[in-house]
């Protein structure tokens, strides 16, 4: 489901891992990215994980991949403070205390298509550990 190629990784120092770290799956999208910015601005270390490598690259360059009022300046500030970064490496969830999933579930005639959601959890379980 997620590409194996790593385009950019600017991981947190080991000291910060799990202390107050949140991983947002679907983090480069219209829900995950603004949520990540809000959490990082409140002091959390945020890892945005997404399969959209184009958006990951744009975010890590300090730009938003879509228009979100006031977010461009905040994103640059949070990247400078090393409070947020984006990657396509799903195994980054191991560094987080909390995981938030923001992936799409398209609806077809009033029925959600859960195929991507279910497949994602099969991929995710390989990276989860006890505690």
Tell me what each language-model feature is.
Residues 2-131:
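Structural/interface elements that position substrates and couple domains in central-metabolism enzymes
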């Amino acid at each position: 489901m997620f590409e194996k190629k790593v385009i950019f990784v600017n991981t947190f120092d080991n000291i910060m891992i799990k202390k107050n770290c949140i991983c947002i799956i679907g983090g480069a999208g219209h829900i995950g990215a603004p949520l990540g910015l809000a959490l990082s601005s409140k002091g959390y270390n945020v890892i945005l994980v997404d399969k959209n490598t184009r958006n990951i690259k744009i975010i890590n360059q300090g730009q938003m991949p879509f228009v979100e009022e006031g977010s461009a300046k905040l994103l640059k500030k949070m990247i400078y403070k090393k409070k947020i970064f984006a990657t396509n490496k799903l195994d980054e969830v191991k560094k987080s205390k909390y995981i938030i999933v923001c992936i799409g579930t398209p609806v077809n005639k009033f029925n959600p298509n859960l195929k991507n959601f279910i497949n994602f959890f099969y991929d995710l379980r390989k990276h989860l550990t006890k505690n």
